[in-house]
């Protein structure tokens, strides 16, 4: 029998970065209960995990319309993923394109594991929606960020758990400039500023210098994309129109 008792709630995969923080705000606008889920998998930029509580606290303090909706936070030790991965996200190696054409920041199976574990927690918590910041538009080559992957995973999870989860990916067709715009639509300039200062994107974990677009080394692919997106957002352009 298909489970139908899930409440109007969402579990958001929340790393502490720009995209997932925007997804938390997006869910808070749409659901009565929002819980968050983070993973420690041995990532080089582990500082992002330290940003999570600051973002959650700031959302509660600065956005009273959301404070009563933001529920429990869950943190999962997924160090086994780092142990079996040989990538620039989990090793101090140079970021480059691998022989298969994928960036060596790709962690095989990461989003599949994240969503599957998220579904198990959501099932226990009685939450209907799983929300993730996967995106095809700012395409880095990650196959587990594709819309087709998420749709297939939704089918598999619902069959395997005999329920009716909805996998929400609000950023799927947005570029980084659009993601900044979405933050402004959700919470105005205060939310944009919260995300700019409190979230973390840099792959190498640099958090000593605050740029116009946020903290970071300014040189890794994640920093460059965040910078281009923020500058395009300020100009009212898309990332594809922005100079490289």
UniProtKB/Swiss-Prot annotation:
Q: Which GO terms describe its biological process?
A: queuosine biosynthetic process
* Enzyme Commission (EC) number: 6.3.4.20
Tell me its cofactors: Zn(2+)
Q: In which pathway does it act?
A: Purine metabolism; 7-cyano-7-deazaguanine biosynthesis
Q: How is the cofactor bound?
A: Binds 1 zinc ion per subunit.
What are the recorded GO MF terms, alphabetically? ATP binding; ligase activity, forming carbon-nitrogen bonds; zinc ion binding
**Which residues does the record give as Zn(2+) binding sites?**
202, 217, 220, 223
- What keywords were assigned to this record? ATP-binding, Ligase, Metal-binding, Nucleotide-binding, Queuosine biosynthesis, Zinc
Write out the residues that bind ATP. 14-24
Under catalytic activity, the entry for this protein gives:
7-carboxy-7-deazaguanine + NH4(+) + ATP = 7-cyano-7-deazaguanine + ADP + phosphate + H2O + H(+)
Per the record, the similarity remark reads: Belongs to the QueC family.
User: Which NCBIfam families did the record assign?
Assistant: 7-cyano-7-deazaguanine synthase QueC
* Function statement: Catalyzes the ATP-dependent conversion of 7-carboxy-7-deazaguanine (CDG) to 7-cyano-7-deazaguanine (preQ(0)).
- Protein name in the entry: 7-cyano-7-deazaguanine synthase
């Amino acid at each position: 029998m298909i489970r139908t008792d899930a409440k109007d709630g969402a579990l958001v995969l929340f790393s502490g970065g720009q995209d997932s923080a925007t997804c938390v705000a997006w869910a808070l606008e749409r659901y009565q209960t929002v819980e968050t889920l983070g993973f420690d998998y041995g990532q080089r930029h582990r500082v992002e995990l330290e940003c999570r509580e600051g973002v959650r606290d700031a959302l509660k303090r600065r956005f009273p319309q959301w404070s009563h909706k933001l529920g429990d936070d869950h943190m999962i030790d997924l160090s086994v993923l780092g142990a079996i991965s040989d990538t620039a996200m989990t090793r101090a190696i140079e970021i480059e394109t691998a022989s298969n054409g994928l960036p060596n920041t790709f962690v095989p199976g990461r989003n599949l594991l994240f969503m599957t574990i998220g579904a198990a927690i959501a099932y226990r918590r009685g939450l209907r929606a799983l929300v993730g910041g996967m995106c095809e538009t700012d395409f880095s080559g990650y196959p587990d960020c594709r819309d087709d992957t998420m749709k297939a995973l939704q089918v598999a999870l619902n069959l395997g758990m005999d329920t009716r989860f909805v996998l929400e990916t609000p950023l799927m067709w947005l570029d980084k400039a659009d993601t900044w715009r979405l933050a402004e639509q959700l919470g105005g300039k205060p939310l944009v500023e919260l995300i700019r200062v409190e979230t973390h994107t840099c792959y190498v974990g640099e958090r000593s210098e605050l740029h116009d677009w946020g903290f970071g080394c300014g040189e890794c692919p994640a920093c460059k994309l965040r910078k281009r997106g923020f500058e395009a957002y300020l100009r009212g352009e898309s990332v594809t129109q922005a100079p490289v």
